[in-house]
């Protein structure tokens, strides 16, 4: 599987390689999904940091009323975190399904053909084995 950084930097080469292998892959959709994935990762990490800070503050708080208020706020943060994580999981599923479909880029010396029948044997090494069955 190709690295997403390589795909971003060499979008045209990857598109041409997929076309050369007769594989249809939407590279633009992959990159937009990756942007969304990175954004959601950033958001979930910031919410998680906020959640951790609130947990620490709740533990330090002595006043029961203030503590109860903080716990109520924490529930809202937790719900937001869960919704963002669900959204991230969905984006990750789609992102991974496209990433798996992206083929490796063929070598530039590979001859082009429209089907498997047009493949050429470029080099033979060793002898072919014959089996008695």
Where are these regions (language model features)?
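N-terminal alpha-helical targeting/anchoring segments
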Residues: 1-128
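Short, intrinsically disordered, charge-balanced linker/junction segments flanking boundaries
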Residues: 129-133
């Amino acid at each position: 599987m190709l690295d997403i950084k390589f795909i971003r930097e060499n979008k045209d080469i990857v598109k041409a390689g997929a076309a050369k292998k007769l594989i249809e892959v939407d590279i633009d959709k992959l990159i937009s999904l990756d942007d969304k994935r990175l954004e959601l990762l950033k958001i979930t990490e910031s919410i998680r940091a906020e959640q951790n800070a609130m947990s620490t503050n709740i533990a330090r708080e002595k006043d029961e009323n203030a503590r109860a208020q903080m716990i109520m706020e924490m529930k809202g943060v937790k719900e937001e975190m869960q919704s963002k994580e669900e959204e991230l999981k969905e984006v990750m599923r789609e992102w991974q399904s496209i990433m798996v479909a992206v083929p490796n880029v063929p070598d530039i010396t590979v001859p082009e053909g429209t089907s498997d029948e047009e493949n050429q044997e470029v080099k033979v090494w060793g002898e072919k084995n014959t089996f008695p069955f």
